């Protein structure tokens, strides 16, 4: 019985901590079921061909092969059906993927200057993962590839408002927030809109502004998207976090976003799913999911440190002058 349990555990899915990850599991199951159907179908065809064209029935080989169009049409029909299934399944899941990101985690919105605290730029290198976060102003600093260096690994353009309080974390845990949505059911006399989604922080701010009981909002069980804006400094890596059902190649010169909605706090292993060099085994990291309050506290602390460091650097330059 213990052996059976071990086998079941070995073939079961890893822990799921992503709101939409069940769709990925469903896709994996669907693909394997289709593979099973194709396997059984082609095995039946294989043995049917062995039986039909056995040497005792056909002692002399015929180089022309099958003259009936039935077999040819059957094989062609099978190929067409398989392609149609592939297109339908791929279209369904791609449509699902591109429509599950909410308006709070779009990289393009951040690039256009919209405040967004839930986008993390992750840059892979041999053999570590580096993260770049927006500061308290909610804006990610502009980048310039020519500025990338040991003292500026993300190539952040200095002396810009958007990048003044950015947070850079090298070769350490990647921090992301678990933020629950509160849906406005009855806005009352406030400026809020019915159906508007608020974080706990935004909810407290609205209650402080309009007064407790001025509107009705309930936690609807959904969470905010977190977007990883992924790239690489050297070779192709692959950002893979099984519990989040996330896997995406990090390609030099390209910034590719991937989003997910974490549902459980904790530390989850990041592995590299591409052979990226002699130290590939060391290409691992940790993505740490924390609560909204912990995220706010961490961001304030890190932005404060960045600001103090910047002020100290300015003071030093002034003293030298």
Report residues per predicted region.
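Generic alpha-helical transmembrane segments of integral inner-membrane proteins
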Residues: 37-44, 81, 85
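Alpha-helical transmembrane segments
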Residues: 27-56
């Amino acid at each position: 019985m213990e052996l059976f349990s071990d086998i079941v555990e070995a073939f079961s899915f890893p822990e799921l901590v992503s709101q939409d990850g069940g769709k990925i599991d469903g896709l994996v199951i669907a693909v394997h079921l289709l593979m099973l159907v194709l396997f059984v179908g082609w095995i039946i065809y294989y043995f049917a061909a062995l039986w039909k064209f056995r040497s005792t029935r056909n002692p002399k080989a015929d180089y022309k092969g099958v003259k009936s169009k039935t077999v040819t049409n059957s094989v062609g029909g099978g190929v067409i059906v398989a392609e149609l299934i592939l297109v339908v399944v791929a279209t369904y899941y791609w449509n699902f993927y591109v429509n599950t990101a909410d308006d709070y985690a779009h990289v393009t919105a951040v690039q256009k200057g919209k405040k967004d605290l839930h986008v993390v730029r992750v840059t892979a290198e041999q053999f570590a993962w580096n993260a770049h976060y927006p500061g308290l102003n909610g804006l990610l600093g502009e980048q310039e590839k020519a500025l990338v260096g040991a003292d500026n690994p993300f190539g952040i353009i200095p002396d810009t408002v958007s990048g003044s309080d950015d947070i850079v974390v090298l070769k350490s845990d990647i921090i992301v927030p678990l933020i629950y949505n509160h849906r406005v059911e009855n806005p009352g006399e406030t400026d809020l809109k019915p159906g508007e989604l608020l974080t706990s922080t935004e909810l407290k701010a609205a209650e402080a502004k309009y007064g407790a009981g001025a509107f009705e909002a309930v936690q609807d069980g959904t969470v905010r998207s977190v977007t990883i804006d992924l790239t690489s400094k050297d070779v192709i890596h692959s950002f893979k976090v099984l519990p989040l059902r996330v896997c995406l190649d990090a390609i030099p010169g390209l910034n590719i976003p991937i989003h997910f909605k974490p549902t459980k706090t904790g530390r989850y292993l990041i592995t590299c799913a591409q052979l990226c060099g002699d130290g590939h085994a060391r290409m691992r990291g940790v993505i740490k999911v924390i609560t909204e309050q912990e995220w706010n506290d961490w961001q304030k602390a890190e932005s404060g440190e960045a600001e103090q460091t910047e002020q100290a650097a300015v003071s030093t330059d002034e003293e030298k002058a």
